[in-house]
């Protein structure tokens, strides 16, 4: 059963937003990137809505290639959403982390929990470290195998003072495989969580088809 605070948000509402993204993409190539960086910033700005909330998104990716063909990649990702008129941010606008930003955890199953419902947070952030393992299956050119270490957090509750805001650092590590096939890019990951909140739900294996690079 939803809490009284969530039940107050039920029903129809009107929302009109302007979304934009500024993207600086200086990668040497989109798949199997080995050098360069990518930086982007976006906003969701309410134009005319029943409730006004501003969302900001920032991400930074940097790739470095070493002489031994090892490619390391560091990423930072952050999102913030806050009300502009002292109203609660709607449950449909609250934040979570994309699946590839925190591997080893079930999508949408971390962060604040209200009466058993995962309601997302006002803040979401993640950092990722990846390093290729070129000594594994080097004969397959369209295949990347990499070690990864992920750090992430989803927290913040604006509609209740009695719910744990879930400000807890989550971490995981494992091995990921990206493979460009005739049917499209495939992505696999095997992960183990290292730290988590008691309410978080984890998963060891993840698979994605048609990942955007």
Put a short name on every predicted segment.
Residues 57, 170, 205-206:
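Amphipathic alpha-helical segments in well-structured domains
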């Amino acid at each position: 059963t939803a809490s009284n605070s969530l039940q107050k948000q039920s029903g129809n509402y009107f929302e009109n937003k302007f979304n934009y993204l500024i993207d600086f993409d200086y990668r040497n190539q989109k798949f199997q990137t080995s050098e360069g960086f990518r930086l982007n910033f976006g906003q969701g700005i309410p134009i005319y809505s029943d409730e006004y909330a501003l969302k900001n998104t920032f991400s930074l990716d940097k790739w470095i290639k070493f002489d031994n063909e090892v490619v390391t990649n560091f990423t930072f990702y952050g999102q913030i959403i806050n009300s502009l008129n002292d109203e609660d941010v709607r449950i449909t606008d609250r934040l979570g982390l994309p699946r590839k930003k925190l591997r080893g955890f079930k999508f949408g199953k971390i962060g604040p929990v209200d009466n058993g419902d995962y309601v997302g947070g006002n803040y979401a952030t993640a950092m990722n470290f990846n390093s290729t393992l070129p000594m594994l299956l080097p004969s397959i050119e369209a295949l990347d195998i990499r070690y990864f270490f992920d750090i992430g957090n989803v927290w913040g509750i604006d509609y209740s003072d009695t719910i744990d805001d879930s400000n807890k650092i989550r971490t995981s590590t494992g091995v990921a495989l990206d493979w460009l096939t005739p049917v499209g890019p495939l992505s696999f990951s095997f992960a183990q969580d290292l730290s988590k909140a008691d309410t978080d739900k984890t998963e060891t294996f993840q698979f994605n088809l048609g990942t955007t690079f």
